[in-house]
């Protein structure tokens, strides 16, 4: 009964929507701050002269992958119910892309 959004009482419905919106905004702000932090870490890694490019390039690619996952999960609302079907296509596309990169890398290098 706690998940029911249409109780017939407008005040209860309004309070429920406000609470859900506040919770969603909190998640959005946390994800945004984490992405800004990851971007600053990437800039710091590039700017720090002691790191070689053999470390910096894979590190930045890892940070980029984490940011893409955050954006898909939070900003594209993949964390919400009812978004399983689009999420399946997105994750399937990522799997096909990784398979293609692996296949072409194998063909070119061997």
Curated annotation (Swiss-Prot):
Main localization of the protein described in the UniProt heading: membrane
Family from the record: Belongs to the cytochrome c oxidase bacterial subunit 4 family.
Enzyme nomenclature, EC number: 7.1.1.9
Record's keyword annotation contains Cell membrane: yes
Membrane topology of the entry: Multi-pass membrane protein
Enzyme superclass (EC): translocase
A Gene Ontology term for the protein's cellular component: plasma membrane
Organism of provenance: Bacillus sp. (strain PS3)
Compartments, record wording: Cell membrane
InterPro entries: Cyt_c_oxidase_su4_bacillaceae (IPR014257), Cyt_c_oxidase_su4_prok (IPR005171)
Organism classification: Bacteria, Bacillati, Bacillota, Bacilli, Bacillales
Domain of life: Bacteria
Key words of the record: Cell membrane, Membrane, Translocase, Transmembrane, Transmembrane helix
Transmembrane segments: 29-49, 55-75, 89-109
Family matches, as Pfam families: COX4_pro
Catalysed reaction equations from the record: 4 Fe(II)-[cytochrome c] + O2 + 8 H(+)(in) = 4 Fe(III)-[cytochrome c] + 2 H2O + 4 H(+)(out)
MF terms in GO: cytochrome-c oxidase activity
Protein name: Cytochrome c oxidase subunit 4B
């Amino acid at each position: 009964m706690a998940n029911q959004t249409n109780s017939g009482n407008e005040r209860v419905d309004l309070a429920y929507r406000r609470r859900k919106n506040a919770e969603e905004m909190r998640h959005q702000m946390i994800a945004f701050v984490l992405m800004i932090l990851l971007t600053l870490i990437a800039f710091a890694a590039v700017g720090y002269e002691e790191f070689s490019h053999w470390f910096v390039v894979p590190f930045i690619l890892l940070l980029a992958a984490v940011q893409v996952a955050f954006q898909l999960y939070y900003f594209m609302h993949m964390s919400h119910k009812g978004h399983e079907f689009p999420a399946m296509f997105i994750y399937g596309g990522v799997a096909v892309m990784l398979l293609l990169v692996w296949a072409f890398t194998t063909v070119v290098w061997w």
